């Protein structure tokens, strides 16, 4: 199948100058780039005009094409290996500058850092100011971050000529890759700084003050902008992310903005009712226990939970459990026996309805087994 004429593909005359070729390529690249044109033929046309530009923008390849046509490249495959196609790289970046608002950056933003900050429940509830200590990478003071020995400076990479990228040409297609020699920096250091060993960065301990807002919870994250590692070649520093972990409390458990606690009561208070003291974040308060309270009964105390900034406060939920008395003396034991006897003399079913239900269920269970 015969290939299209490269001049025809770009829509230019055979005597077109270098600027005409570049302008034609930019115009067609914007029109047929797959990211902008979803037509099924756009990708094919984009590859064709890219191939045409690679040949016509290179004086030697253009001369060979003008003399021999497409056969000039059938044997050599247009060469191979890494090379710095500066014309193609520049115009390609120009096109993407129009697409995305700027040239691609070779500089690399600093790495983000993470730190786990442990808080007590009281600190998380009320808010706190905490200091954290980390070790991070900062610019080397001896070389001012250049990585080069004092009195010297980095030199332009001879492989990519400072572009930071090379192009592997396979037939009519060009693969863009990071320069293997300078690793995308576009510069090389001949005499590295002894302090940072050419890295331009050194480790240094840092102390930061962190304002913890009231009501924060475990797994919440605070971001300190620009407090991460320094960037490459003047790029911005990364951020420091402070992950919050709230320690377990010896009284309260937390769920969002609500607090939960278990409170023991004696069986007399459970049976007859009364008042007990329960803890809150603001101090102890009185809680009224109604008569005939059972273990597991939960009492809600409004607005005594977590009080986050500018949000509705949570509630406190107190679950009571009846504590069985221990280490009884003989008098106490006799009183309990007398009480138990009084239950027998009256209707125990009336005093202990749950026991009655259980015994009836157990009898029914065994009856079913024997039938």
From Swiss-Prot:
Homodimer. Its main location: cytoplasm. This is Chaperone protein DnaJ. One of its GO terms (biological process) is response to heat. Zn(2+) 1 binds at residues 140, 143, 193, 196. InterPro entries: DnaJ, DnaJ_C, DnaJ_domain, DnaJ_domain_CS, HSP40/DnaJ_pept-bd, HSP_DnaJ_Cys-rich_dom, HSP_DnaJ_Cys-rich_dom_sf, J_dom_sf. A zinc finger (CR-type) spans 127-205. SUPFAM superfamilies: Chaperone J-domain, DnaJ/Hsp40 cysteine-rich domain, HSP40/DnaJ peptide-binding domain. The keyword Lipoprotein does not apply. The keyword Electron transport does not apply. Zn(2+) 2 binds at residues 157, 160, 179, 182. Gene3D superfamilies: DnaJ domain (1.10.287.110), Heat shock protein DnaJ, cysteine-rich domain (2.10.230.10), Urease metallochaperone UreE, N-terminal domain (2.60.260.20). GO terms for molecular function: ATP binding; heat shock protein binding; unfolded protein binding; zinc ion binding. The J domain is necessary and sufficient to stimulate DnaK ATPase activity. Zinc center 1 plays an important role in the autonomous, DnaK-independent chaperone activity of DnaJ. Zinc center 2 is essential for interaction with DnaK and for DnaJ activity. Binds 2 Zn(2+) ions per monomer. Its cofactor is Zn(2+). Pfam families: DnaJ, DnaJ_C, DnaJ_CXXCXGXG. PANTHER family: CHAPERONE PROTEIN DNAJ, DNAJ HOMOLOG 1, MITOCHONDRIAL-RELATED. Belongs to the DnaJ family. It comes from Hamiltonella defensa subsp. Acyrthosiphon pisum (strain 5AT). It is found in: Cytoplasm.
